[in-house]
Curated annotation (Swiss-Prot):
Encoding gene per record: psd
Protein name per its UniProtKB record: Phosphatidylserine decarboxylase proenzyme
PANTHER family, per the entry: ARCHAETIDYLSERINE DECARBOXYLASE PROENZYME-RELATED (PTHR35809:SF1)
Active site, renumbered: S182
Record site: Cleavage (non-hydrolytic): G181, S182
Length: 212
């Protein structure tokens, strides 16, 4: 089933494709087979892009799961005001072919929520973390604080994040998406042992990024 976050886009895409096909059938009937095939392909890809499969969420309460499908782009040490010194940055690159529904990485309470306007550099460009439009989300579970960031990209210029400050959230819960690719950056405190490596594929809600 497609995610509800994509219903508007799906409706608009379907209407445009149907209208285009209808107009071609009237004014340029010779191009109808090509137009109909192209329109069907666009609709099928849009449905594929907004797919939202179920996931097996780990029951272990001491793990942090991936917030996004994709591939580990970068792991590096980082000091951050929200998570403290000796934190670790883990960046997940999402291609247009990945599932784009994002999921909460651990149980806790939303204590930080900040939208930051910015540029739309390519997601695999590490400057995008600082320069691009993004949504910062911070969770506190009483034992540690984790920050994760939805980063817009060159193609992905629409961040969806319906969360609210002081909202209680559960690990693996769907919470939004980044439309048409980009990246999600995680900043994990020193207490977290990183369980992934660069180049590894991730599955939102299932892949264990770290333990604490």
């Amino acid at each position: 089933m497609p995610t509800s976050y994509g219903y508007t886009t799906l409706l608009k895409t379907t209407l445009v494709c149907c209208l285009l096909t209808a107009l071609v059938s009237i004014f340029l009937p010779a191009l109808l087979p090509l137009t109909a095939t192209g329109s069907a392909a666009v609709i099928i890809f849009t449905l594929y892009f907004f797919r939202d499969p179920e996931r097996r969420i780990p029951l272990d309460q001491q793990v942090i799961v991936a917030p996004a499908d994709g591939k580990i782009l970068l792991i590096q040490p980082l000091d951050h005001a929200f998570t403290g010194n000796d934190s670790t940055l883990v960046s997940i690159f999402m291609s247009p072919f990945n599932v784009h529904v994002n999921r909460i990485p651990l149980d806790g309470t939303i204590v930080h929520l900040r939208y930051v306007p910015g540029k739309f550099l390519m997601a695999f460009d590490n400057r995008s973390m600082e320069s691009n439009e993004k949504m910062e989300i911070g969770i506190d579970n009483g034992s540690l604080r984790v920050l994760f960031i939805q980063v817009a990209g060159f193609l992905a210029r629409r961040i969806v994040c319906p969360l609210h400050r002081n909202e209680s959230v559960l690990s693996g819960k769907r919470f939004g998406m980044i439309k048409f690719g980009s990246r999600v950056d995680m900043i994990l405190p020193a207490a977290v042992k990183i369980m992934v490596q660069s180049g590894q594929k991730t599955c939102a809600g299932e892949t264990i990024i770290g333990r604490y």
